[in-house]
């Protein structure tokens, strides 16, 4: 089999057109027959345990289940590779093609993509400009409609207003319109603010895309009127009008039986639901819409920056109007981003409506036979089965000319089945299996910590790597880490085998592997020799900056946990409450040289973000130093004993003769600056004398020469001083 490896710089994810989906799955056989469409909901034949033809595991569509063997068994040899069986139509090739060959389902009725109709922001609603708010800046058209109502009710002498919308748009620019609007606001001054807010948003708010796609309406009039509303609104938007004709009010319950003929004529059956949304999306001219939206954003900005006066009426009206314009501008900014992305990627907005549904390869949704004749299958097979069943049932209902109510219900069920396949629970109700377990959809497979991206693409398992919990290793050096013995044997196995053969301890690789499996004592010195000159990488996810991966010199430790120096925790953003870290072994000489020259922990002392030290004692280390140097605790074992040097103190502490906080006197050989807080002076028989200070005792001879001097301290302070001197090589 010929494998082609193509180099690429990046991967671009965008909307797939129906023709592209067909290219993924559509194939032509030598006999002229096209395959690729999944027409049956069956998976396998439960008598022969073979995939059903044209089903979800069809060998003719996705490839053979067994390599180089057709479904009917006529051809079973390597010499027939590439041949297509004339009896069953199966191509003789490797079975691994079932991991990438796709199929498709021709949907009888188009459905909307749930990611674009039930998302925030709602992409389709933004493109069609029906996103919860009235899409116009001038409110005069609606106000004039109310003025007529006022005139009819109160019989006031209000001048006549233009009847057509084009005349109205010209009329709005005149000073007369501003005067009449002021009169109107005086009439409405007694009205509540909430009523006016609802009045402004009422007409567009009732156009709900979910109601269109899922056929949700209280009666026939509301159902057809909803689609009529969208068509009229979109037609007026294309002409540049600021409003659209109002939908007739719904009738009372006793008059809702028959749908008016004029509504049926204005909204044909084939222009309802997702078909209508698809037609409106197809009619969008992206270039013109971008220009119109940019101009609208500029107009909103001028009004908000008071460059162009807009509202000269009451304070609360002006405040509310500015809030509405802010909302319109924000939605227009979101809309122009969507339009520019569609234009850049060359995608058509109508591709958000699915007419051809791709079927992923069967190896990615397997069916496994268990003991006892039962089968375990992926949830995707059940979701695909529902779609095919409902799609075929809708086709039969259309063929027999079933009532429209039944057909609409079946279309809604088909829409819900596709929604569940793409993202189960996105629209509210979660589809459950027979055991009341939520079915795993395509979105569930790719998202989250255990999804396809983070688990299999970003977090791939590689050779010469391991993972374990980290624990603190306070006795380690800064460039060291504790590596568990079992992990070291497994990671460095090839290096150990080579060293065993080079030293003559094993004659071949098989003997060396047997020595490793039997855990012979001879392995330990060989392992230490290998680790002496071989660093390792430690990585903690997420790797947010370059210090998330550092090199260390491994030290063999017992147990199964990786020991880490506490000072490097801040660079890894790690703590010891169950965090895990990954171990990687650099194989090439270049990688090992990079470890020693650039990536060792002592060489990463400063933070690359701000240049400040990132290796600093904190938390347990500060508390430990404080506890180690605490004094003024009386009545402890060995208090006020005298010691010749630091070694005597450490020896006494190791023999449990003194405690960590015991107050002791230690001889000090260096010169002490003139002490203060003199207490007393005692003269001895040999004419020498002892001067007592607060923390110092000095014995001098009769010539004032110092014989010996002692400092008062604690065992813990001696230990801290001894460690610092040893580390800095200051100890004599």
Curated annotation (Swiss-Prot):
Record InterPro entries: DNA-dir_RpoC_beta_prime, RNA_pol_asu, RNA_pol_N, RNA_pol_Rpb1_1, RNA_pol_Rpb1_3, RNA_pol_Rpb1_3_sf, RNA_pol_Rpb1_clamp_domain, RNApol_RpoC1
Sites where the protein binds Zn(2+): 70, 72, 85, 88
GO terms for cellular component: chloroplast; DNA-directed RNA polymerase complex; mitochondrion
Keyword set, alphabetical order: Chloroplast, DNA-directed RNA polymerase, Magnesium, Metal-binding, Nucleotidyltransferase, Plastid, Transcription, Transferase, Zinc
UniProt similarity note: Belongs to the RNA polymerase beta' chain family. RpoC1 subfamily.
Localization of this protein: Plastid, Chloroplast
GO biological process, alphabetically ordered: DNA-templated transcription
SUBUNIT field: In plastids the minimal PEP RNA polymerase catalytic core is composed of four subunits: alpha, beta, beta', and beta''. When a (nuclear-encoded) sigma factor is associated with the core the holoenzyme is formed, which can initiate transcription.
Chloroplast as UniProt keyword: yes
GO molecular function: DNA binding; DNA-directed RNA polymerase activity; magnesium ion binding; zinc ion binding
Protein's job: DNA-dependent RNA polymerase catalyzes the transcription of DNA into RNA using the four ribonucleoside triphosphates as substrates.
Protein name per UniProt: DNA-directed RNA polymerase subunit beta'
Gene3D superfamilies xrefs: 1.10.40.90, 2.40.40.20, RNA polymerase II, clamp domain, RNA polymerase Rpb1, domain 3
Lineage: Eukaryota, Sar, Stramenopiles, Ochrophyta, Bacillariophyta
